[in-house]
Regions:
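Short, Lys/Arg-rich amphipathic segments at extreme N-termini
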Residues: 1-22
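Amphipathic, well-ordered alpha-helical segments in soluble domains
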Residues: 4-11, 39, 94-97, 101-104, ...
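Short, contiguous alpha-helical
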Residues: 16-65, 114-173, 222
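C-terminal interaction segments
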Residues: 207-261
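A glycine-rich beta-turn/hairpin centered on an aromatic-Pro dipeptide
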Residues: 157-198
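Amphipathic alpha-helix face/heptad-repeat signature
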Residues: 1-4, 87-90, 94, 127, ...
Length: 261
């Protein structure tokens, strides 16, 4: 997380205009920076059991996308700063605060995340990986906007794959009634099973379950597809995203079963 935040801060420092529209987004560079700051601050507060800042913006719905959209819009108003150079320092400060408050916590300790769902939670390790992933993926967005190189290593992509988020980000409209087992092979990384039972997803270690569809993916492409930054069709055409098994056609549907995390 520290390395990812440092990288994002360096990128923000290099951009003079916080009002620059981010490519493929409704946000500006300044708004993306503010979002990254609050993400770090909000989870640091959650680790300490405080939800006072975020609670007023949580709507009365259990739909992940609606809750997160409302909370994100509301919390952006709490941080009016949009100058990239100032936000760069705030990102570093907020990352350090999060690392400080979690330094003595076990990686499997649970932290509540009510902005995702009333009963939603992540492990401490999962929260840290999620925040690192946010730095990488939103840094990618900003870098694309200013034509700045932003290489993502296989190791980084493997570490920040948001496995704990998978059950939370199921799209109830597209997953309704769906029952199937998918085994995902992140090349050079983990193998895990996503089990759907009547539209409800769970993530399990791969241990010989009956599998309907195997998916093999380059971790970087998988990360960008999962976060909705690229279409699945390019990696499929290049052999970097493959499906096989008893029902290989289910692979084409897999991404659409989820909201972007």
């Amino acid at each position: 997380l520290e390395a990812a935040a440092n990288r994002t801060a360096d990128l923000l420092h290099s951009i003079p205009d916080g009002d620059l529209p981010v490519k493929g987004s409704d946000w500006t560079v300044g708004e993306v920076g503010a979002h990254l700051v609050f993400g770090l601050q909000g989870l640091a507060q959650a680790v300490e059991g405080s939800f006072d800042t975020v609670s007023p913006y949580i709507p009365d719905t259990e739909v992940f996308r609606d809750r997160l959209t409302a909370v994100t819009a509301g919390t952006l108003e709490l941080l009016p700063e949009r100058r990239p150079s100032v936000l760069a320092k705030l990102v570093l400060d907020a990352a350090q605060t999060f690392l400080t408050v979690t330094a003595e916590r076990a990686s499997d300790e649970v932290v509540r995340t009510p902005w995702y769902g009333s009963q939603a939670s992540l492990s401490m390790g999962g929260a840290t990986r999620l925040l690192a992933g946010e730095q990488i993926i939103h840094g990618y967005d900003i870098a694309q906007t200013v034509a700045h190189r932003w290489p993502i290593s296989t190791a980084d992509a493997v570490v920040v794959l948001p496995l704990e988020m998978i059950p939370l980000v199921v799209n109830p409209a597209t997953a309704r009634g769906h029952t199937a087992n998918y085994e995902v092979h992140a090349r050079g990384g983990p193998r895990f099973v996503v089990r759907f039972n009547d539209g409800v997803a769970a993530v399990e270690p791969a241990r010989g379950q009956t599998i309907d569809c195997h998916l093999s993916a380059d971790p970087v492409d998988l990360m960008l597809v999962v976060y909705g930054r690229i279409s699945q069709w390019g990696p499929i055409a290049r052999g970097r995203l493959l499906a096989w098994g008893r029902k290989p056609w289910l692979g084409l549907r897999f991404k659409n079963l989820f909201f972007n995390p």
